[in-house]
Amino acid sequence: MHTYPFLDSHYNPDYWGILPGEEDLSDEEKIESAMKRAQEFAVSQYESVRAYMKSLGVDKPIHIGETGWSTVSDDYFGASGTQAADEYKEALYHKLIRQWSKESGVSVFYFEAFDEPWKDQNSSDGSVNHFGLFTVEGQAKYALWDKVDEGVFEGLSRNGNPVVKTFNGDRQAMMETVALPPVKK
C-alpha cells in the first residue's frame, strides 16, 4: 500500500491543521502536533488495509511501498494552500514514520532519496519535484542533518558535490521558511 498524508493535507484534510485548544502552544509544538496526526493518519490507513485483508481471510504481510513528504510547493501545499511543504515538517514525518515502522515491524519505503526536478516540468517548485531527503545536487535536507554531523556521508558525493546540509546548516534560516498549518475552525 501507499500512504501520503502530505497529499491528504489537501485532498482529505480532516486531520490537518491547528486544532482548537492548540492555540497556546508554541509554533513548533503546533507543527509537531499536526505532524503526529499526519503519522497517525498514515497508520490508520495501514490499519484499514490490514482489517480489510483480514475480513477477506487474507493473512499476508502488508508493506508500505511508498510514503513521504515534500519540502517545496507552489501549489496546493504551499503558502496559498495547506502550508504542509517544508523541511521541518518533512523531518518530523520522516522521524515519526520510521519510529512507528521500527516499533511495529512494518516495512516502509520512504519516498524518496533525491528530489526529481523533472517530474513537474511546468513548475520547478511543484511539490512532486521535492520529496527527496536530498536535493538533486546532493545537499542533505533537515531530516538528515544529524547524519551529516555523525559523518555518515563522509567521502560520498553527488555529481562531484560533497554531501552538506541545506541552508548551510543554519536551523534558524531553515525555520524561517516554515509556515504554520491553517487553524481548524
In which residue ranges do the predicted regions lie?
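Conserved, mostly hydrophobic/aromatic
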Residues: 64-66, 108
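Aromatic-rich peripheral "rim/lid" segments of glycoside hydrolase catalytic domains that contact
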Residues: 75-96, 100-185
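Aromatic- and acid-rich polysaccharide-binding/catalytic face
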Residues: 1-40, 69
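Alpha-helix N-cap and loop-to-helix initiation/capping positions
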Residues: 33-44, 81-89
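Generic structural signal for well-ordered alpha-helices
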Residues: 43-50, 94-98
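Short, well-ordered coil/turn segments that N-cap beta-strands
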Residues: 58-61, 104-106
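Sec-exported extracytoplasmic/periplasmic mature domains
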Residues: 4, 51-54, 102
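Extended, well-ordered alpha-helical segments in internal regulatory regions
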Residues: 8, 74-75
